[in-house]
């Protein structure tokens, strides 16, 4: 069962584009703060939606290599987004981040990324300083009957929550 007395960060392997976060958000019992690729926030058609949903942009290395922004700008954008997501989680919201995976046609494991863990630890520090419950990490499995087909059956599997404990959060940051 998903904890309802604290914020949580859902972490899944990303295989199916924009469908994955939607499937998780619709099957979750909390309101969400959203993080997403920086180029989703800047694309003409998608940006209209992502701005209205207050999606926090995350600049990836691939976007830096394409020249989407400078390294200094990326550091500022990512730092601000991490703080916004962590603050939302610390106040009891849900969040979903996809640290691994590629498109459904090339679904293979990639090098592990640390962003989700850094986000939930920052959320834990904020929650601890405000006297709120420490957040949990929720591992998620996304399963599709036939992932190549549009409108295929999907199953969202929530793993047991990985609860942060007081010892995980230093007293001074």
Indicate where each model-derived feature is located.
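Soluble catalytic domains of membrane acyltransferases
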Residues: 1-171
